[in-house]
């Protein structure tokens, strides 16, 4: 029996089917992507999308919100339990909007922000000039150490003492090492700054106590996405232990930057928060890290330069210029896509290439670990990637690798 969508809108139906096929037949190594459970998908596609619910549970601007009040309260309580937080806001539509809500709540225009530079692994919303965060606030960047390619806390401290920012941001989009949130708290205390931790990429590890929790280090506020390692729907989350800050955050999210929350997404967040409390989920998170470490070590053995010489989480960067000065992330990502291996180009510390080309690629293990990959699979995958790069001009050889990948993906769950 044909689906209603295929009859009513065959073009969109066909594109969804093509994307389903692409996700099935490709090895996905985008660090910010994952595969949600059937239950999360079912919840997102539910009739909850019909309900408008401006406001917060018990304080809505529309009537008929009893059921969605209960759903949002469940999501809030599960988020609080998962991260051992006193307060949670589950309404942000994205991580970027969660960050925007925090900055709007805690800062005045032209206040100073100190965060990791984008090239070194930071995020656009942490103060980049093209983002709202760089337009409305004075943004300053710290860098990783040029030798170790890791955070240099004493250097960050000196910069903070010089700049005296109102907000310090710890948490990144392309940094492969554990973050010492306690060190950041000490630095923030010295300059009387707020400390915001953006755990969008490492939320799954924090939830399972495999990485330090910034709230335990007295971070003032924590933001996150609910996808990536947390393996929920695409959306944002804000956590804090401070009542006054939570009141400011709630006003900043609504009515500050958002209207009606997406109740079908909030319900899916609740489902994913329950999933994240299971032993199975913790085992998954442990495997994500093991896989990333085996993957990175295999590239190192093959002579590739892995930024910071390894990883403590789900991702790592490869500096392609160390392999061939003519390589760019754009070029290598395109070559790998030809053989159905999907990575993203990425800037590396102190990158001299333009952002649309970059000197590196970023590789992540969450999605394929969800598919069932173990360390041996990532060791094999590193070999295929190496072969594709070395034989990049041999289309016959690339087709051979693509066939091997297609045969392999047929076994995916």
Swiss-Prot record:
- Which GO terms are recorded in the biological process aspect for this UniProt protein? glycine biosynthetic process from serine; tetrahydrofolate interconversion
Q: Which Pfam family, any one, appears in the UniProt record?
A: SHMT
Identify the metabolic or biological route this protein is part of: One-carbon metabolism; tetrahydrofolate interconversion; Amino-acid biosynthesis; glycine biosynthesis; glycine from L-serine: step 1/1
Q: What is its main location?
A: cytoplasm
Q: Which PROSITE patterns does the UniProt entry name for this protein?
A: SHMT
Write one Gene Ontology MF term: glycine hydroxymethyltransferase activity
Q: Which keywords describe this protein according to UniProt?
A: Amino-acid biosynthesis, Cytoplasm, One-carbon metabolism, Pyridoxal phosphate, Transferase
Q: Where is this site: Plays an important role in substrate specificity?
A: 227
Subcellular location per UniProt equals:
Cytoplasm
Catalytic activity, EC: 2.1.2.1
Q: Enumerate the cofactors the protein uses.
A: pyridoxal 5'-phosphate
The entry's (6S)-5,6,7,8-tetrahydrofolate-binding residues are 118, 122-124
Q: Which residues form a coiled coil?
A: none
SUPFAM superfamilies given in the database record: PLP-dependent transferases
Under the subunit heading, UniProt states: Homodimer.
List the PANTHER family hit by this protein, alphabetically.
SERINE HYDROXYMETHYLTRANSFERASE (PTHR11680), SERINE HYDROXYMETHYLTRANSFERASE 1 (PTHR11680:SF35)
Q: Summarize the protein's role.
A: Catalyzes the reversible interconversion of serine and glycine with tetrahydrofolate (THF) serving as the one-carbon carrier. This reaction serves as the major source of one-carbon groups required for the biosynthesis of purines, thymidylate, methionine, and other important biomolecules. Also exhibits THF-independent aldolase activity toward beta-hydroxyamino acids, producing glycine and aldehydes, via a retro-aldol mechanism.
Name of the protein in question: Serine hydroxymethyltransferase
Specify the species.
Phytoplasma australiense
What gene is it encoded by? glyA
